[in-house]
């Protein structure tokens, strides 16, 4: 019976017995602790988790059975567009395609509205909006109302140029008004007459019988009331103080009107007439050049009916340039006579060359005025218009050593200095009083001395 046993079966039994013994034996390696026995202080170096070490079987890197394998979602062919898009035929569009077409047409229909708004901003008349329904017209109407003031703003820029010119003229008139506030009523009347002149007359400022460039220069002076600036004439004249130039500008504008009414009555030079006469270049003052004194002669000079004073415009050019030709209109003392103080130089009429050089002496002011041929007593000091001081006469006498001496003489006030007869009648009266203590000198010698002294003063003034 023993011979009948199969050796293969016996070998199988042996293997089974060995496996059972191995299972009964204790495990050789450390057993994995239960979940409640995990130590949170341990950290696995492989997976980075806490509670086990890298040698533990709980590590998913060691035991892949416990690891969670990411499950694949699978492949969906519907999500991927493998076939290219083919253009559809628009002959029979579906309902969805119709809605899309309407949405695309709406912005296209708003283009004419945008053009209309652009025309409104540019100031052009807007075009008629297309009949697109209530939704298309309402927004355009709202925008038109909101942008209404824009065309007014653009068109209002053009007429703003005229108000600027009006403002400048208003400032000039206000400046003249400020000057008129400090002037007398007679001087205001002269300025009102100057404003009535045309612009062409203001530029020329001369009548038909005023052919001299110096007279043309006088026409511009009324415009320079607030800040007067006098340019030098051809012959060269001196600067004028601002106080003298303001009043002179007011009177120059009124001069052409009175001259047109009545021509020159006398050839006796007056202060406003030869304002720019070059004569000997003497420092002769002009009557209206400074502030008016409170005297009757000054008021008569500013009075328009007094027309004999308007005759000096007919002075020939030889008399204006008499300094070079040897025919001086006025006589002037040498610089030694001006040592009394900064005052205007005296004047002598050319009608009285044989008399003793007794001339009107003006109250002192800052600087000498323009050379003029003045025949009446005038005050140029700014404060003299309010003081009412009596005019002074200065007597110049030539000494034996060639020098001059001056002395002040009280002179009676003139009542009508405009009339040449009155002045000539009173001038000898004063000269007779002063001729007693002085020595009579030939007029030719006096002319030569005065011409030399005036030329030296001109050179000094040019250097200044």
Curated annotation (Swiss-Prot):
Compositionally biased region (Basic and acidic residues): 74-89, 97-114
Pfam families, sorted: zf-CCHC_6
Bias type Low complexity, positions: 180-197
Disordered, as annotated region: 1-42, 70-389, 415-437
Source superkingdom: Eukaryota
InterPro entries assigned: FAM90, Znf-CCHC_6
Other comment: Primate-specific FAM90A gene family, thought to have arisen during multiple duplication and rearrangement events.
Similarity remark: Belongs to the FAM90 family.
Name the UniProt record assigns to this protein: Protein FAM90A15
């Amino acid at each position: 019976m023993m011979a009948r046993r199969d050796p293969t079966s016996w070998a199988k039994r042996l293997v089974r017995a060995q496996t059972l013994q191995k299972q009964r034996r204790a495990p050789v390696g450390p057993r994995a602790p239960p979940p409640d026995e995990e130590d949170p202080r341990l950290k696995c170096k492989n997976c980075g988790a806490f509670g086990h070490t890298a040698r533990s079987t709980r590590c998913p890197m060691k035991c892949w059975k416990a690891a969670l394998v990411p499950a694949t979602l699978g492949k969906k062919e519907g999500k991927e567009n493998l076939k290219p898009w083919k253009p559809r035929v628009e002959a029979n569009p579906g309902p969805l395609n119709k809605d899309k077409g309407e949405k695309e047409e709406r912005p296209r229909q708003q283009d004419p509205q945008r053009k209309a708004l652009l025309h409104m901003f540019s100031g052009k008349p807007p075009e008629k909006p297309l009949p697109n329904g209530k939704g298309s017209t309402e927004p355009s109407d709202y925008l038109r109302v909101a942008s209404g003031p824009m065309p007014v703003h653009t068109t209002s820029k053009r007429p703003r140029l005229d108000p600027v010119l009006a403002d400048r003229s208003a400032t000039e008139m206000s400046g003249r008004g400020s000057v008129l506030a400090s002037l007398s009523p007679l001087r205001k009347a002269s300025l009102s007459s100057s404003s009535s002149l045309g612009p062409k007359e203001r530029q020329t400022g001369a009548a038909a019988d005023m052919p001299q460039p110096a007279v043309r220069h006088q026409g511009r002076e009324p415009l320079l009331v607030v800040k007067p600036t006098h340019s030098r004439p051809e012959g060269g004249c001196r600067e004028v103080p601002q106080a003298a130039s303001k009043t002179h500008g007011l009177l120059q504008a009124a001069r052409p009107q009175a001259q047109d009414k009545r021509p020159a009555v006398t050839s006796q030079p007056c202060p406003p007439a030869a304002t720019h006469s070059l004569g000997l270049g003497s420092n002769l003052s002009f009557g209206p050049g400074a502030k008016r004194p409170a005297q009757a002669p000054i008021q008569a000079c500013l009075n328009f009916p007094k027309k004999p004073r308007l005759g000096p415009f007919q002075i020939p050019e030889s008399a204006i340039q008499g300094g070079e030709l040897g025919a001086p209109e006025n006589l002037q003392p040498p610089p030694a006579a001006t040592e009394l103080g900064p005052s205007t130089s005296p004047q002598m009429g050319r009608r009285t060359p044989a008399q003793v050089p007794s001339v009107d002496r003006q109250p002192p002011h800052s600087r000498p005025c323009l050379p003029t041929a003045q025949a009446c007593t005038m005050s140029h000091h700014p404060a003299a218009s309010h003081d009412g001081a009596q005019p002074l006469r200065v007597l110049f006498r030539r000494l034996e050593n060639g020098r001059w001496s001056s002395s002040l003489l009280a002179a009676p006030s003139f009542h009508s200095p405009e009339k040449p007869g009155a002045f000539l009648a009173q001038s000898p009266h004063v000269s007779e009083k002063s001729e007693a203590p002085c020595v009579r000198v030939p007029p030719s010698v006096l002319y030569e001395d005065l011409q030399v002294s005036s030329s030296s003063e001109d050179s000094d003034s040019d250097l200044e």
